[in-house]
Amino acid sequence: ANSNSRPHLLQTQKPFSVVLAISITFYLLLLNKVNSEEALSFTFTKFVSNQDELLLQGDALVSSKGELQLTRVENGQPIPHSVGRALYSDPVHIWDSSTGSVASFVTSFTFVVEAPNENKTADGIAFFLAPPDTQVQSLGGFLGLFNSSVYNSSNQILAVEFDTFSNSWDPTARHIGIDVNSIESTRTATWGWRNGEVAIVLITYVAPAETLIASLTYPSSQTSYILSAAVDLKSILPEWVRVGFSAATGRSAGYVETHDVLSWSFTSTLETGNSGAKQNNAHLASYALI
């Protein structure tokens, strides 16, 4: 991969209160913008079978508990060689070539990764944006998103991964990473995965500041993990994308886990705003990271 073209990231572990303050700041920043050109918003507090708003790929299904079960479970146990994805059915207008404007977005979701053996976990789950016709890719460490670890701008994929297995292109520990057109993350932060516990994720993109922030919090321990990146969506994604989740289990027997999404909300707003508003928003975004 061309590391020189990849964004700088802030990686840290912060108390829950700090993450909450940052999250609220960015959420309000997005919602208080004016001159909206297009907006898309949806919320799933639970999921139901045959839901028109969802496109399920691979092994993904809605469980009897109303959860998005991305990888296969047989007789109560996760199995290897499984990959599944779930996407929102309506494409998102993420940027406009006629005006040059780029959408801001915020998404929040809860998920659980549970493994029978804490010493044999694989492979992880990701939230991603990709072209509307995106299909399942390779399983295992590629998380159903890519077929190679080589950076390729034609992939047109932006993802935030929650990775439980160390592949050859990964750091040596479980981690959170931001992926730009490659499964080899641009930067990573160590993730203290907690087996079977609910994680709360907030991912925000503030277009005027070209800033992407991802945070994961375990309420049970008030432990949080944060990544921040400068990301130019126009250089990565097509104008229209689909958003969703992808997950995969390991290729070897025993290296398995469940990947269940419990709830999900998403809001995007494509703005026309003036330059002064953009400067003010960019300043606020920068200030929130100090």
From Swiss-Prot:
Family note: Belongs to the leguminous lectin family.
Gene Ontology molecular function, alphabetical: carbohydrate binding; metal ion binding
Pfam families: Lectin_legB (PF00139)
Protein name: Lectin-related protein
Stored InterPro entries: ConA-like_dom_sf, L-lectin, Lectin_LegA_CS, Lectin_legB_Mn/Ca_BS, Legume_lectin_dom, Leguminous_Lectin
Keyword Protein biosynthesis listed: no
Stated role: Does not have any carbohydrate binding or agglutination activity.
Organism lineage string: Eukaryota, Viridiplantae, Streptophyta, Embryophyta, Tracheophyta
Keyword Calcium included in the entry's annotation: yes
Superkingdom assignment: Eukaryota
Binding site for Ca(2+): D163, N167, D170
Signal peptide: 1-36
Subunit architecture: Homotetramer.
Binding site for Mn(2+): E161, D163, D170, H175
Residues with attached carbohydrate: N119, N147, N152
